[in-house]
Amino acid sequence: MTQRLGVIGSQRNGACVLASGRPWNRDMADVLGSRTGCDFVLISDPKELTTAKLTLINPKFVFFPHWSHRIDSSIYGQFECVIFHMTDLPYGRGGSPLQNLIARGIYETKISALRCVKEMDAGPIYLKKPLSLFGSAEEIFLRASGVIENMIIEILEELPEPRPQEGVTTVFKRRSPDEGNMATAESLDQAFDLIRMLDAEGYPNAFLNVGPFKIEFSRASRKSDQVLADVRISIADNAKEKDENDKNRK
């Protein structure tokens, strides 16, 4: 049975919290509740992720399948918080893991389930599972959701002891929207990867600025000598600003 934060009851004792605001995780709490028989409480608003709310729920675990917000030390210090990161840690700590991997020509990765600690993505590892990075970002995130569901069930059933990370640490920098500019692509493969790795709800699409126009790309497919994609053409922000300034001068 899955419950929301607005519902309070003693049956919540020992429940689990699922923190994610991403659309591809929308049904995960319901699915996990059905598969495990446990109460899963979904938190999608960062403002609701407070020690007061979590104390009321008293969760065994707080799972973060896709969470881009800061987790306060009062939360991970009091509750067992498990983050799911889309790299084979300690390689690829930091932001935009999916995009940074594909930009480096890496098409197979692992999802690492780790304990939340003060240093970003540095906590001990519960387990890792493989993940393919082929397809659009939306398809990859949906695929990752299925993998993460199984990982959560394994954590609940096996209660693995998290182990320190081993290997050389590599840190990724969070990518900015400007890095989606198609002018940086030097081959059809790079153009295809740039389009698909940004093709998900909530992400800025790959784009080109041509004169006053901004051309955004999605739904790419790779052919032998070309890339096919849907395009959306709009007036670029700088062109809108110039047009507004010209009107104000008249």
Describe the function of each predicted region.
Residues M1-K250:
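One-carbon transfer enzymes
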